[in-house]
Amino acid sequence: MSKPKRERSLAENEAKAVARMLRVSPQKLNLVAQLIRGRKAAAALADLQFSRKRIAVDVKKCLESAIANAENNHDLDVDDLVVAQAFVGNGLVMKRFAARGRGRSGRVYKPFSQLTIIVRQVEAEAAAA
């Protein structure tokens, strides 16, 4: 007695990977996500490899996971993959105490983010354009 299978929310030529609890603000993560939106998967990996942003390592891991999901779970051709969507969501925000002068206190916010990457297989001639 297992639950009935859900319908697939993505198209047949798409695969998805999600990275949760990334310890960075959504605003900073979105700067890196903008780099790879709409790019070929190989070019996006190269961009992330040489990015100077700290979070680019985690974005690269998530993109590699999406590529692996496309290849292994959905039988898509890795060479024709394009980053169709890369979007960022809010995670939880840890609030911490910071001692200030004269017996006062301040708040330190430690935000977390979520990253979703969807790769799509496109035709070879469309990917070259």
Curated annotation (Swiss-Prot):
GO BP annotations listed: translation
Family per similarity comment: Belongs to the universal ribosomal protein uL22 family.
UniProt keyword annotation of Repeat present: no
Subunit annotation: Part of the 50S ribosomal subunit.
Function: This protein binds specifically to 23S rRNA; its binding is stimulated by other ribosomal proteins, e.g. L4, L17, and L20. It is important during the early stages of 50S assembly. It makes multiple contacts with different domains of the 23S rRNA in the assembled 50S subunit and ribosome. The globular domain of the protein is located near the polypeptide exit tunnel on the outside of the subunit, while an extended beta-hairpin is found that lines the wall of the exit tunnel in the center of the 70S ribosome.
Stored SUPFAM superfamilies: Ribosomal protein L22
GO CC aspect terms: cytosolic large ribosomal subunit
Xref: Pfam families: Ribosomal_L22
Molecular function terms from GO: rRNA binding; structural constituent of ribosome
Protein name per its UniProtKB record: Large ribosomal subunit protein uL22
Underlying gene: rplV
Key words, A-Z: Ribonucleoprotein, Ribosomal protein, RNA-binding, rRNA-binding
